[in-house]
Amino acid sequence: MIEFNKDNLKIDMEIGLLPFDQGSIAAILYPECDVAEKFGVEGLKNSDIVFSVIVYADRSFLSAQYTMDQDGGEEHHGYEPTEAEKELMWQLLENCSQQKYGCTLEKFPAVFQRMSQANHEVALN
C-alpha cells in the first residue's frame, strides 16, 4: 500500500475552524499519488476525491476522511492514517499555520477568530 509522504501529500493553504466547534481545525489535503491504490477503490482518480482532516490544535485528535464523487453523489469514507502519516499531517498543518497566519497551530484558533472578527467589522462599515 502507498503511504503518504512529503512528496505525495500537499495541503491547501486555507485552513479554518469548524463553525460548530471553534477548537477544531479543518483542512483539505491533496494526494499526489495513485488514490485508487491508496484507498483500494478500482478506477478512482485524484479528481474524484476530496481528502480532508479535522484536528484539535492541542494535538489530542486527528480525523481523516476522503469524499468520493461517484455517479453524481458523494460517498464519505473514514481513513485511519499510519503514525508516520499522522505526523506528516501535523507538520503540514503547523507549517501552513506559521506561514499563512504567523502563529503556531496551537494558537491558530484564537488568531483565526480575531482575524475573522476584524474582517466582519470591516465588512459592516
Regions found by a protein language model. Give the residues of each.
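Charged, low-complexity interaction regions
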Residues: 101-102
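Negatively charged, low-complexity tracts enriched in Asp/Glu with abundant Ser/Thr
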Residues: 1-41
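Short intrinsically disordered terminal tails
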Residues: 1-3, 114-125
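Acidic, low-complexity, intrinsically disordered interaction modules
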Residues: 20, 30-96
